[in-house]
Amino acid sequence: MNAFPEDPGGAREEPAREGGDASPSHVTPPGSAGLGSVPNDVLTGPLLEIPRDPAWSGLDVVRLTVLSIVALFVGVFTVLFIAHFWIDPHSPLLSLARIPLVVVAGQALAYLLILGYMVVLVTRERGRPDFLAAIHWNWPTSPAVYLLVGILLSIALQLLASRLPIPKHLPIDTFFRTPAEAWVLAIFSTTLGPLMEELFFRGFLYPSLARGIGLPGAVFLTAAAFALTHGSQLLYSWGPVLVIFLVGMVLTMVRAKTNSVAAGLLIHVAYNGTISTMMFFATDGFRHLEKLNQ
């Protein structure tokens, strides 16, 4: 029995008719039924071009990566200058850059810019008017299944992390100094954050790699890239990076199995949401964040 619902858009083979002859001489090739009634000019005309899947190339993904890095700098610096000139003109830029709310706001702005370019790349540059179809969004018929998988995955990997060497203090901890910062990160990590990560890694990167090197290599490299992207927040410590790598493996395998980016998004949201919920209760509603370091 499959762990996940089958792709609703997938093709199914029709069973052979009872008593029918399944020999090749009696089988009509796909698309050849009724050819005798088709005009000759149709048969001799130019062949219809099969749409490229994915519509983008590896170079497009490289360009998207570079532009994403540029957008992150633009987004953070834009918010930084706004905070400096209109909110707190007396604080130096360097001190404002250490404020988690400024960083998250800049990252959110950058993500919106990146999302806009993703749509332009697919619909305008590659001629696919249906963006969601092109990236294989495919909202699953049983979303609760994937939410449950995300919750169980989060609990299981938190148990694993408790047995791994985790540094006492990580850069990500600076985002949990005040209740406001904790709330903002909790909301961001269950909305725009996982959406953009799934669009990039499972929507754009994975299918491009799968076409070039095959499914196993694409799953591994996508998960590795996903983990390395989070490495700076974790001091590249092998324990927490391994946990993120395993998350990436599960998300990418679900993408490969279900042909659905949305399925992975549901798991990702539930995974992050479970961690945020655990932290919420462990710190009395984010009011006693010092308990996280005890």
What is the predicted function of each stretch?
Residues I151-Q294:
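Transmembrane helix-loop-helix hairpins at the membrane interface
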